UniProtKB/Swiss-Prot annotation:
Gene (name only): cysG
UniProt: NAD(+) binding residues: 22-23, 43-44
UniProt lineage: Bacteria, Pseudomonadati, Pseudomonadota, Gammaproteobacteria, Enterobacterales
HAMAP family: Siroheme_synth
Species in which this protein is naturally found: Escherichia coli O81 (strain ED1a)
The entry's keywords: Cobalamin biosynthesis, Lyase, Methyltransferase, Multifunctional enzyme, NAD, Oxidoreductase, Phosphoprotein, Porphyrin biosynthesis, S-adenosyl-L-methionine, Transferase
Record's protein name: Siroheme synthase
């Protein structure tokens, strides 16, 4: 993060704009809207500045820039068409530890101006860090279309209710659930827009007096195989509403950055062959947090019902009568194959796909004879440590040694690495890779050279 987004309280605080043209006028409008006590310095001014000055809204200082104008300022903007003058203003402000924006020169500025969506008191700021103002503007326009014009009235009304809500609902969780109900109530929003006081009062009383569901719940969310962009919209909504997020080592930092900031985070770092927290204890963590009335998200890599032990966790909750739901995710087989240019099925090469765990329990044995058959694709999860055994068994049961294989490490992430070869090389290839990795075996692997689009690693 190159810039920290902050919202400044400028009401009745001295601010300076150097420049008297159209660009300076646009900046002045923003500062005046924020209630700043504004001084504008330039050699000449467009008529709008004169009109504002005549109305007593700002002070004009006609003449060359004088550094002393900054002495009482909280914030300054250099908005002239003279680069040297803009630089001088910036340096003078820097020497006084005053934040200064330099129009069209973000590297010379100590702060930048974002694109703004104003639904006061709700404000949304969009910034590209000065690298692409057009992109920021396009995003602002898209957000403008999504946010109702009366949203600010709802936010202002919520501020008026805060004291009563705090008295009415004892816990933070109860208050949050009330606010969520209020903000999605279309009737209240429309009543506020129409200034219909009777309807506003009736709807508010109904919302406040409705019994809240004090039971906790658990939502099992599949986070996908790595790329945060593959998280589903519903999954995103759930992690942003959670009181507690229980997650493991397969969840990327990019995804964790999307979690609600004040949610509790419980790390239970699992990996094949080793569990930082035993599965039974994970089950109990989910149960305990839900019994406290909290909304718990169990965030799992891939899809929670495909080698994710999601069923085991939900059985514990079901036996205890805890409400639960499941948000599917893109499983590793689908994500890794797509990002590696390997179609799992193909009319000429594979009419079926088998998803197999390579993390076998002691004494467990797979149906190797059927797995060795042609016209199918095998995908082994957690199979890196068993690669030599997989190679030996498949060849022993008749799979050709030249069968194409691929191992995908950190699939779909920017650090994805893929190596391919033949079945006779599988054990050797596995020694070059690290967990988490996925093994794909089948004729479809031979299409990778033609269909690979994501990387050449």
């Amino acid at each position: 993060m190159d810039h920290l987004p902050i919202f400044c309280q400028l009401r009745d605080r001295d601010c300076l704009i150097v420049g008297g043209g159209d660009v300076a006028e646009r900046k002045a409008r923003l500062l005046l809207d924020a209630g700043a006590r504004l001084t504008v310095n330039a050699l000449a001014f467009i008529p709008q500045f004169t009109a504002w000055a005549d109305a007593g809204m700002l002070t004009l200082v006609e003449g060359p820039f004088d550094e002393s104008l900054l002495d009482t300022c909280w914030l300054a903007i250099a908005a002239t068409d003279d680069d040297a003058l803009n630089q001088r203003v910036s340096e003078a402000a820097e020497a006084r530890r005053i934040f200064c924006n330099v129009v069209d020169a973000p590297k010379a500025a100590s702060f930048i101006m974002p694109s703004i969506i104003d639904r006061s008191p709700l404000m949304v700021a969009v910034s590209s860090g000065g690298t692409s103002p057009v992109l920021a503007r396009l995003l602002r326009e898209k957000l403008e279309s999504l946010l109702p014009l009366h949203l600010g009235q709802v936010a202002k009304y919520a501020g008026q209710l805060r004291g009563r809500v705090k008295q009415q609902f004892a816990t933070m969780g109860e208050r949050r659930r009330f606010w969520e109900k209020l903000f999605v109530n279309d009737r209240l929003a429309q009543s506020l827009a129409n200034n219909d006081q009777k309807a506003i009062t009736e709807t508010t009383e109904q919302l406040i007096n409705e019994p809240l569901d004090h039971r906790g719940e658990v939502v099992l969310v599949g986070a996908g195989p790595g790329d945060a962009g593959l998280l589903t919209l519903k999954g995103l909504q759930q992690i942003q509403q959670a009181d507690v997020v229980v997650y493991d080592r397969l969840i990327s930092d990019d995804i964790m950055n999307l979690v609600r900031r004040d949610a509790d985070r419980v790390f239970v770092g699992k990996r094949a062959g080793y569990h930082c927290v035993p599965q039974e204890e994970i089950n109990q963590i989910l149960l305990r947090e839900a019994q406290k009335g909290k909304r718990v998200v169990r965030l799992k890599g891939g899809d929670p019902f495909i080698f994710g032990r999601g069923g085991e966790e939900l059985e514990t909750l079901c036996n205890a009568g805890i409400p639960f739901s499941v948000v599917p995710g893109i499983t590793a087989a689908s994500g890794c194959s797509a990002y590696s240019g390997i179609p799992l099925t193909h009319r000429d090469y594979a009419q079926s796909v088998r998803l197999i765990t390579g993390h076998l329990k002691t004494g467990g044995e797979l149906d190797w004879e059927n797995l060795a058959a042609e016209k199918q694709t095998l995908v082994f999860y957690m199979g890196l440590n068993q690669a030599a055994t997989i190679q030996q068994k498949l060849i022993e049961y008749g799979m050709p040694g030249e069968m194409p294989v691929a191992i995908v490490e950190n699939g779909t992430a920017v650090t994805q690495r893929v190596i391919d070869g033949t079945l006779t090389q599988l054990g050797e290839l596995a020694q070059q890779m690290n967990s988490p990795s996925l093994i794909i075996i089948g004729r479809v692997v031979g299409l990778r050279d033609k269909l690979n689009w994501f990387s050449n690693h």
